[in-house]
């Protein structure tokens, strides 16, 4: 992965056409698939909420990592399919002109894991996902502590397009520089889902229960309405084999012992 500090990776280094001007964070480009990654430093953050399913609030230490600024796109996933002969998503929208920079959907958890391994990364743990979404200030939403329907893609503003490009809604960028961690598509995480996991999870780099029936999904989507689903702490379980038009994913890569190449 090619690291950049205080500068923007050149467009020709990317495998897809996404606007990312204006980001001032420490960025890198994952060479395998062109994903723009942002560095999240090691440290504690308050995970969870007082609401049912998201409680209790608890301090978690998360080691440093890189996370995708954007969700993986249809164009990127098409490259993966061509390189590996992996099965296509359940729809063929990834082949439509103008859709290559929309998030890939209609993929299972195993599909997302296969892509991540091919790209040299992994799915984020739900702790990694939540820390990035809430930013250094630990906000309720990526942009602040108050719901603002204009800052993310949801049922009331989707129009006829359902998803939007992964660089859409710049007003909803998190404090770490990630786009659309509220709305557009739910995102697969690595962890099994457990309602009571927070009461017994480790305080350092939690990875979820050892087993379960559902995998964690985060973020809310274009088909959801109301502020609840879009909170950074909101957790939901999804059947790993279920493919739908409102679920995608983004990559993470470890920051140590060195930036991957």
Regions flagged by a language model, labelled:
Residues 11-15, 33-35, 147-149:
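Short small/polar-residue motifs
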Residues 28-89, 106-110, 182-183, 251, ...:
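A short glycine-rich, aromatic-capped structural motif
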Residues 46, 50-51, 87, 92-236, ...:
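Functional-site microenvironments in short loops/helix caps that host divalent-cation chemistry
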């Amino acid at each position: 992965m090619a690291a950049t500090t205080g500068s923007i990776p050149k467009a020709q280094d990317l495998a897809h056409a996404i606007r990312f001007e204006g980001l001032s964070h420490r960025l890198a480009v994952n060479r395998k698939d062109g994903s723009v990654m942002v560095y999240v430093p090691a440290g504690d953050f308050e995970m969870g909420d007082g609401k049912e399913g998201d409680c209790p609030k608890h301090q978690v230490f998360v080691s440093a990592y890189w996370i995708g600024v954007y969700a993986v796109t249809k164009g990127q996933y098409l490259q993966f399919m061509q390189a590996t002969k992996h099965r296509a998503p359940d729809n063929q929208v990834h082949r439509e002109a103008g859709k290559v920079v929309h998030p890939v959907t209609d993929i299972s958890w195993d599909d997302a894991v296969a892509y991540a391994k091919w790209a040299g990364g992994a799915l984020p743990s739900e702790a990694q996902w939540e820390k990035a979404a809430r930013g250094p200030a630990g906000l309720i939403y990526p942009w602040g502590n108050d719901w603002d329907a204009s800052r993310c893609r949801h049922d009331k503003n989707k129009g006829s397009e359902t998803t939007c490009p992964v660089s859409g809604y710049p007003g909803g960028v998190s404090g770490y520089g990630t786009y659309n961690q509220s709305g557009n598509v739910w995102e697969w995480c690595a962890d099994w889902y457990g309602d009571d996991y927070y009461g017994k999870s480790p305080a350092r780099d939690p990875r979820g229960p050892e087993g379960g029936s559902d995998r964690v999904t985060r973020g809310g989507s274009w088909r959801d309405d109301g502020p609840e689903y879009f909170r950074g702490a909101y957790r939901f379980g999804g059947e790993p084999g279920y493919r739908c038009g409102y679920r995608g994913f983004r990559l993470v890569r470890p920051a140590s012992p060195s930036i991957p190449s």
